[in-house]
């Protein structure tokens, strides 16, 4: 999809590259996306079509191509053209500083419509979000549910340490994940 005369994936790729967080790869089973990225001068790797999650796809690239490097691997969704490079950098910095094995990002909702929008993933937490600490997520969901806890807009980016990623892909999918 073109946004400002540029494919969506290229906006995401440029943000990831501008974060100066390390090598950027597009992992996809879609040859058209691979061609777009490579024509732009980016790195794209064709992955299996059989993955159940994006994290499984990222692990395939990590396992086959990165020789157990780097220590933190970021899974960034390809349909997020507005992701800021600072957000990517901040996730990695916080994970390193706080020795977190897994991290993700969330933000305040910009409107009530976002809370009711089933296309926007919500994250439920007990504490207010701030820049200086990570919070433990209680749940992630799409539909607006009544909660006595605090809800934020989940941003589709995940960071894993090498060890956590290797463990995560071996886990069985949870009942909640399968239901959704």
Where are these regions (language model features)?
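Short, high-confidence coil segments that cap the C-terminus of an alpha-helix
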Residues: 21, 68-70, 97-101
